[in-house]
Amino acid sequence: MSSSISSLASAPTLSTNASTSSIVDQLVQAYVQSISTPVYNMQAQVSSINSTISVYQMLKSTLSNLQTQASDLSQIGTLSPLAAQTVTSSDNSVVTATAQPTATAGTHSISVSQLAKSDTLVSNELTQSGTSISTATGAGTFTFSITVNGKATNVNVNVAAGDTNSTVLSNIASAVNSSGAGVTASVVNDTSTTSRLVFQSTNTGSANAISVADVTGTLLQNVGWTSSVISSRTASTSTGAGYVNTSTSTLDANFTLDGIPIVSGSNTVSNVLTGVTLNLAASQASTANPVTLTVGPDTTAIQTTLNNFISKYNSVVSTLNTDITDTTSTDSSGNQTVNRGSLAGDVSIMNLQMSLENVVMGQVSSAASGGPTSLSAIGITLNNDGSLSISDQSKLNSALTSNPSGVIALFNSSSGVATQLNTMLQQFTNPGGVMDQKINGAQDQVTQMNNMITSMQQSINLQANAMQQEYSAYESTLIQLSQTQSNLNNIWSGMASSGMAV
């Protein structure tokens, strides 16, 4: 019997502690992995749909850019960017000009005999360090008025006893410049010891002739601007007060346009030729040849507009080609894999691609009589990849110069290229349009799938927790059994050592 006791005492103990916990964790993790496959698959689907959403958003952006360009080109009349006009001058040193789309093409002759000038009023020459002004006026605040273009402005100037002429002139200039009277005042040091006060009208022309008068005191009178000097527009001299231009008529620009004499108070003239602004730069001798102004289509600006249109159209084509075309890749072993386009099989997108090609390749039934009826007629053709390019620059240049209205109608008439594109693309890019429907539908799908993923993960977590608890209970039982075994082993060992028989 002692041998039996010895056998019991030496029986293997039940395994517990850290090794059991590790095994339990591994079992639970393996179980979670085995039932998480649907979650992983759905997460992959969500990632794929999100990629598709990004593709839709990028496509919508490129379509919107083209739609905006098409909308501009479909504008009627002078609103069309293709109606841009320009003016060339045979002598830019005499006159330049700019044109709005409302300008009428044609040639004009202009001769400039006099430029518009600002009115200039100059004071007496005064010794800078002298006190003749302050001595004559005495100390105090003095008011004078400045009248320009029918508006009188009162100006107040403080004079202190003993102020030098330099100080008084500076104070007058400062007060005038902050008055908003339409006059710029400055002090000119004509010698090292003398100065003169100068008033100059801000704007040119006889309407802006300067008139000044003392209101209180004799401040202006003491710089030489007496009432007689002002009323008679006395000419200034090297030392005496007066006007640089004694006649107000010399303040206006004088020119002839197409033989018609014109007087303007400004050298910038925008009310003579419709849509044209003249910029007079220099007067001419009476014997000089007239300057020729030519108004016509701004081919440079129009070319830029057409290039922008082609660029935006080609961006759409490039995006569509990438999104709906399957590609084939070959690995190092020569195995080929077909990569499906992100939007391959999307019928509405594929139809859009075909519709775009039909518009830019088709004939425009509403084209102007005698004008181009297709893009190819002005040198713009379709390439093999569906993109547009200017294949014949000379043909385009000829169309822009010989029939600009026909080119405009090719785009903006009722069935014009831009009109058709604008109508078509609005269906895709407008709020709630095709692209928004696709994006919103895909986003709703992602939301639903994410909710399902959350629900499945919660279920998996519950199952994992239940399994963890079950194994924990099993481990607790093992610990109790192990303790019982240990106690029994101790008892049997004690009995065996005392020689007790059982």
PLM feature spans:
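Bacterial flagellar/type III secretion structural subunits and associated motility module proteins
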Residues: M1-S47, T68-R196, Q200-L320, S342-S459, ...
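Acidic/polar N-terminal loop/beta-strand segments that form early-domain functional surfaces
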Residues: T52-S54, L59-T62, V87, S113-L115
